[in-house]
């Protein structure tokens, strides 16, 4: 079974993002970039399936700028077998929209004969949480989102999901799309020997045009702004003073 894992290059989650002065977006100049954390979890899960003998090959795919090759090398160092970089933008500020990403991934999955796609549930830069669902719809495959546990049983995948008030376990027929939640696993660190080996693993470069997909944006970002700072609180000396302050604020 071939497993396809999409990975996205974005601002490292330890870095505090800065909004551009004109409010047009996030400033990516001289900022450390890394793999989307949910995608790291997806890569790890694919590797674990291979270690169990349930996957034959893991293909990592990234869609965006050429610099995303670094992100793919990370996936290869973790344990992916080969990678495909689909160059769909020249400007690092351009974020390829979920629908275009889903269309490209669907084309890659068909070309590669993939039976399982494991993706992060969302990217932490835009929090769209849409690509996996769109991808399943385009392919006409079953989908299991927000997975906290994945088990392959013959021609089916049994997926446990966290829902309000408990856990839900569903079984989906393969081929399928699974999106990874935070509690699915703890991703491994790539060892130095594996980082060196990753440089020799295949990394093919394609373009969106190779798959016949138009990546022109359909959404317009009107403005981006940082969250408002939290106002300092005050200490009150008595219950009466607290009640008075609440009345002043119009709470009671």
Curated annotation (Swiss-Prot):
Cofactor: FAD; AMP
Key word Electron transport present: yes
CC cofactor note: Binds 1 FAD per dimer.
Keyword vocabulary terms for this entry: Electron transport, FAD, Flavoprotein, Transport
Molecular function GO labels: electron transfer activity
Gene3D superfamilies registered for this protein in UniProt: HUPs (3.40.50.620)
Pfam families noted in UniProt: ETF (PF01012)
Function: The electron transfer flavoprotein serves as a specific electron acceptor for other dehydrogenases. It transfers the electrons to the main respiratory chain via ETF-ubiquinone oxidoreductase (ETF dehydrogenase).
Similarity comment: family membership: Belongs to the ETF beta-subunit/FixA family.
Subunit structure: Heterodimer of an alpha and a beta subunit.
Name of the protein this chain belongs to: Electron transfer flavoprotein subunit beta
């Amino acid at each position: 079974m071939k497993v396809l894992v999409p990975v996205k290059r974005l601002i490292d989650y330890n870095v505090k993002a800065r909004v551009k002065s004109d409010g047009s977006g996030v400033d990516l100049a001289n900022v450390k970039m890394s793999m989307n954390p949910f995608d790291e979890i997806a890569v790890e899960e694919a590797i674990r399936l291979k270690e169990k003998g349930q996957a034959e090959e893991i293909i990592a795919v990234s869609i965006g700028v050429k610099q995303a090759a670094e992100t793919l090398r990370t996936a290869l160092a973790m344990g992916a077998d080969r990678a495909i970089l689909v160059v769909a933008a020249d400007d690092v500020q351009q974020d390829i929209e979920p629908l275009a990403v889903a269309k490209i991934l669907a084309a890659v999955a068909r070309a590669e004969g993939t039976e399982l796609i494991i993706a992060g549930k969302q990217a932490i830069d835009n929090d769209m949480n849409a690509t996996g669902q769109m991808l399943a719809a385009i392919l006409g495959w079953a989908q299991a989102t927000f997975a906290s546990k994945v088990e392959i049983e013959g021609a089916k995948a049994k997926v446990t999901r966290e829902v309000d008030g408990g856990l839900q376990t569903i079984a989906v027929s393969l081929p399928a799309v699974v999106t990874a939640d935070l509690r699915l696993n703890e991703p491994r660190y790539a060892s130095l020997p594996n980082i060196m080996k990753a440089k020799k693993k295949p990394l093919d470069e394609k373009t969106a045009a190779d798959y016949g997909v138009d990546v022109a944006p359909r959404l317009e970002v009107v403005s981006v702004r940082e969250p408002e700072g939290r106002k300092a609180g005050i200490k009150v000396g008595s219950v009466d003073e607290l009640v008075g302050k609440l009345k002043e604020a119009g709470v009671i």
